[in-house]
């Protein structure tokens, strides 16, 4: 992995490839490369280690590499160290077949040994070079065409992959194939684009095809032909991407993350409005009926990372509003557990990209067991969106920063809306009560805007926190779930060691980590748990901790305890997480800025984890 872009048309390919790759930088990478063909000439390949700027220098921003057909790649090392040699594209021995690849080929060592016996030589440590030479093997040995050669290779390869391949004998054409790893194809004005994610081509077209699992596509100027793995031609419908191209730009902000934090009021409002008709929740577009909801006996929420933290918060809300027991599971663990899923269950899969490998595998596991699945995703046409029985689309738009903010917030409100409608459908909440809570939910975007007005105070505290070696977050109930997200933000972009604990668990071990000056951030928005969490904060303060209190207006006694206090507007306690998470996002952001780090592209991380 991590980013793929391809183009064939009349324009010069290199600038388009470099521009597309720059839109995928948020996915994380350690090297980059392009291969471009000028008519029937041999492809010119340029690769570099490090930032994309190095590749741009080598190619004079693409002007030095001529041709109207090409493929490009940003690599995040999985097999082989980060280096120019291991960077993509990779080629056959005679350079007549060239390819880039996302994913992991699990049996690459076995295939490499067999190809070596057939006199192929390998110069890199990558599994991608194995894929290229396997395609070349079938292409030459059996005198096959590109589609047949790729299909034969796909049958032999085990693992996940998205491939873009060029053949010297087929100028102006790009061949793509995928299994489990995302790939989209765009078309506009007689030109054709391919990419691993929407932002790479959004500037050029909003009309895209989604290439399915175990499918192959042939790209020509303004034309795409699709095949299944049996080499039979298949038809597909174009999908229009609704995202605004400007949403994938910084728009005057220093970082995408800060821009996306400020976009949260709008995207939360849009997501709420997407399922409200005549003042009531309407899930007709999701396809989830009241009758189905009334029969659900158990809910499993399955996700990874921040989406898992969403699930933890939503669990409390659903269980408060309904009598349905809810279990929240890490997708990477769920799929391997020998658990019996309760009949009439619902498995909710939460994923911004809709391509998260472990979440997708968990969805398939649930479907195999005959359990209804619901995807909460942000990308229309993504794998989870296509395969889930029901889909709730969040309207966050393109999220570029690796650290999620606005997608998290839209997932959270999607969870609230599900909880409310489950309660009404099951007769556990009146329409009147639901209407009152909806009215309060509609105030959340305005209250987020009010919190953002206080960001300078949070920046001041972040500057003091930047020198910390450790940081701890504590809370109870929903506040604990929000603390987990705040802790993740801190560690993933500021590289400060950070952990979150249920406040009641401090005395069972974690309190031994508290020493003089260590920052402890307490989240206290659940009024019935306020005094208990305060007592835990008193415990850590007595052992030398420096306290930040995050609570609602009216809890002014926090001033007497904490060294720094952030207040959020009052709201229904079930929805408080949508407000309390905002200062924690800002805190993580400003600590990272104070330390001089690349906020949008933290080390060792990728935006969309499409391998296991």
Task: Describe the role of every protein-language-model region.
Residues 264-268, 272-300, 390-519, 592-612:
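Active-site phosphate/pyrophosphate-binding segments
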Residues 4, 99, 165, 176, ...:
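Structural beta-sheet core signal
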Residues 231, 546, 559-561, 571-612:
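Generic C-terminus detector
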